[in-house]
């Protein structure tokens, strides 16, 4: 049994792990024209960049790779007095896109996350388990973006292929 979906490994992204209270993070990101999402486990998008609120005091900023140096200069000024931490983690993650009419079915096999739209609406973002490992799931138009630690990317790719083709 095959599914009406496509799964593709994505190219590199600039990824920043940001930790701190919401007011400190909002202040830091205001320089980029971002405001933090109104609710946890949600993302906001601006100019192809996505800010995901993924924990009580944790955010991820995802941006095109070519913006990494510019964002690093803006987000990590040489001022240790600021009360949030920003760590560049671009090399830590690999991203996959899962798109198509049956993207929900694919994700339901890969993860125990309740992806019904009432619980996981457009622009939702959450860490969950994917094939037994920790992964980030972002609801996108017609599907999902999924991030896993880079060392697991080949394994996750094989698992996704087995699910997609029904061979495994």
Listing of model-derived features with the role each one plays in the protein:
Residues 1-168:
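Basic, glycine/lysine-rich polyanion-binding surfaces/domains
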């Amino acid at each position: 049994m095959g599914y009406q979906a496509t799964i593709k490994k994505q190219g590199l992204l600039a990824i920043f792990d940001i930790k701190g209270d919401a007011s400190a993070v909002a202040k830091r990101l205001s320089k980029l024209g971002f405001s933090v999402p109104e609710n946890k486990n949600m993302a906001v998008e601006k100019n192809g960049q996505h800010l995901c609120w993924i924990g009580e005091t944790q955010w991820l900023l995802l941006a095109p790779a070519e913006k990494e140096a510019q964002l690093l200069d803006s987000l990590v000024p040489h001022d240790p007095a600021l009360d949030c931490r920003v760590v560049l983690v671009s090399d830590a993650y690999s991203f996959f896109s899962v798109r198509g009419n049956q993207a929900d079915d694919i994700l339901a096999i890969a993860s125990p996350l309740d992806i019904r739209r009432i619980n996981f609406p457009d622009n939702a973002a959450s860490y969950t388990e994917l094939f037994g490992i920790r992964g980030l799931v972002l609801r996108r138009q017609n599907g999902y973006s999924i991030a896993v630690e880079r060392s697991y990317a080949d394994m996750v790719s094989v698992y996704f292929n087995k699910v997609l083709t029904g061979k495994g």
